[in-house]
Amino acid sequence: MPRRAREYPEEGELVVATVKRVHNYGAFLDLDEYPGKEGFMHISEVASTWVKNIRDYLREGQKVVAKVIRVDPKKGHIDLSLRRVTQQQRKAKLQEFKRAQKAENLLKLAAEKLGKDFEEAWREVWVPLENEWGEVYAAFEDAARNGIEVLKGYVPDEWLPVLKEIIDSYVEVPTVTIDAEFEITVPKPNGIEIIKEALIKARDRANQEKDIEVKFTYLGAPRYRIDITAPDYYKAEEVLEDIAEEILRVIKEAGGEATLLRKEKRIRKVKKRKK
């Protein structure tokens, strides 16, 4: 079970918890990411409507996403709320928890290869990476995208080769793909050649940038689709803007017309390309 680097959760933090005991007035829950820590959820924090029977909402052994509303480390008290968690927040937290589980499994594999136990791995790798990146899997993604050197200085050097091997094999790098369409016309005998040359130059120039992939697809005159894959949405938008400006300039100088038609972004995950 993945655990956080700090001893206590912070107020406002979302946590994954397992219902331990249910009473008429509230419930006690174990905090999965904080071993040995127990939180209390008053019946008034279970739902936004009046709760006649708390067991209609909570049962022993059930896993929930709760919001931490009060923390008193001196007394060891942690108060939780279920009603203050939106469906979107719940979904995002569960995804984060799954990423932490995957990071934990990968770190266990690395520790096994080095002949270390997980407590050593947790102290030497998990804690510093979480403190720097916020979550360990985000650090692994950064290493997958930019090279294992990004972890240097945060973890002992002996971990780097085995972490590189595992990250290269198992870590998926999230990418954003956006697409749009161009309507391009050049009323000249060599109009098709002018359009083709403009698209190829724009594509090749963009593809020289790291982690950028641009592809054009002919949809039938006068329409052309562009697909841009980048590490994040903002970079993809920046590339599209640069390409559009270049294409519109070249086509206009050639006496033609070009119009950019936008579409929605798509998010996908791809395996890191081997270098």
Curated annotation (Swiss-Prot):
GO terms for molecular function: ribosome binding; RNA binding; translation initiation factor activity. InterPro entries: NA-bd_OB-fold (IPR012340), S1_domain (IPR003029), S1_IF2_alpha (IPR044126), TIF2_asu_arc (IPR022964), TIF2_asu_C (IPR024055), TIF2_asu_middle_sf (IPR024054), TIF_2_asu (IPR011488). Keywords: Initiation factor, Protein biosynthesis, RNA-binding. Residues 12-83 form the S1 motif domain. Signal peptide: none annotated. The keyword Protein biosynthesis applies. It comes from the Archaea. Heterotrimer composed of an alpha, a beta and a gamma chain. HAMAP family: eIF_2_alpha. eIF-2 functions in the early steps of protein synthesis by forming a ternary complex with GTP and initiator tRNA. Belongs to the eIF-2-alpha family. This is Translation initiation factor 2 subunit alpha. It comes from Pyrococcus furiosus (strain ATCC 43587 / DSM 3638 / JCM 8422 / Vc1).
